[in-house]
């Protein structure tokens, strides 16, 4: 990479933010990147062949959560929990209309080993389902706003939720912080990020691969967009990365890694 041409520059915005702007027209060639560029080690885990362990469907979110000793994967028959060796433990929740069930799919999840909890966010809903790691339902967390294709981060020490939401025109907030009782602490209105008219083929990306909480919108319609970082002190989304497509934007989304941005 050190011999590759420079295709991006840092730009200072009127608000004083530093944003990296990639000029797509400067990309003239392709290179082969070894996997070791992005990871120092990896492990393949066989999830087994037992009927109850089979992942039958991952559409409608396909949420996967990995912690040091657990793997959680959404399947059409529930959210399946495995240990780090791939041994099936149990299923959490199920599709239905019960108090601990979801209507369509599990869209995001988080495993908190320290506190023996798994948190599941349905694709559409007003609560986060909570289970212990043995599969027992716990009191749910009410959401301050309803979510659509949302993402979340749990601060288990402060007992806070950071929730990202699809910025539809009727969405109350596109990002907010709340406590575990549902009390709203901070929020950001969608503003210029609004998707009008609402289109469920769009999505949001919150990769959480760095110490920053990143946020970007995937548009099914070709458009120019930006990857943001949440600035908690100022309670705003600060621009961090974008691509200059000139007059010909292509279908894409962004993923942020500790030392790289991926455009795919």
Model-derived regions, located:
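Blade-loop segments of beta-propeller domains
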Residues: 48-60, 78, 82, 87-115, ...
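Short loop/turn segments that connect beta-strands within beta-propeller blades
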Residues: 83-87, 132-136, 178-183, 230-234
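Asp-box/WD-like beta-propeller blade repeats and closely related beta-sheet repeat scaffolds
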Residues: 103-104, 121-173, 184-196
């Amino acid at each position: 990479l050190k011999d590759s041409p420079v295709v991006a520059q840092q730009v200072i915005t009127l608000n004083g933010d530093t944003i990296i702007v990639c000029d797509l027209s400067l990309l003239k060639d392709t290179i082969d990147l070894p996997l070791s560029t992005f990871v120092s080690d990896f492990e393949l885990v066989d999830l087994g062949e037992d009927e109850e362990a089979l992942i039958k469907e991952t559409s409608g979110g396909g949420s996967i959560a990995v912690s040091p000793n657990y793997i959680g994967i959404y399947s059409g028959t529930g959210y399946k929990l495995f240990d780090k060796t791939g041994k099936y433990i149990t299923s959490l929740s199920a599709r239905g209309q019960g108090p601990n069930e979801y209507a369509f799919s599990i869209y995001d999840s988080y495993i908190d080993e320290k506190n023996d909890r798994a948190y599941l966010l349905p694709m559409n809903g007003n609560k986060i389902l909570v289970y212990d790691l043995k599969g027992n339902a716990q009191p749910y967390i009410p959401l301050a706003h309803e979510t659509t294709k949302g993402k979340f981060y749990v601060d288990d020490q402060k007992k806070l939720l950071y929730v990202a939401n699809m910025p539809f025109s009727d969405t109350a907030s596109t990002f907010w912080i709340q406590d575990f009782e549902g009390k709203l602490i901070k929020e950001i209105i969608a503003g210029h990020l609004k998707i009008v008219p609402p289109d469920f083929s769009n999505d949001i990306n919150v990769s959480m691969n760095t110490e920053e909480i990143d946020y970007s919108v995937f548009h099914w319609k070709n458009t120019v967009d930006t990857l943001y970082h949440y600035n908690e002190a100022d309670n705003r989304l600060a621009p961090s990365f974008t691509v200059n497509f000139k007059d010909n934007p292509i279908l894409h989304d962004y993923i942020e890694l500790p030392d790289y941005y991926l455009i795919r």
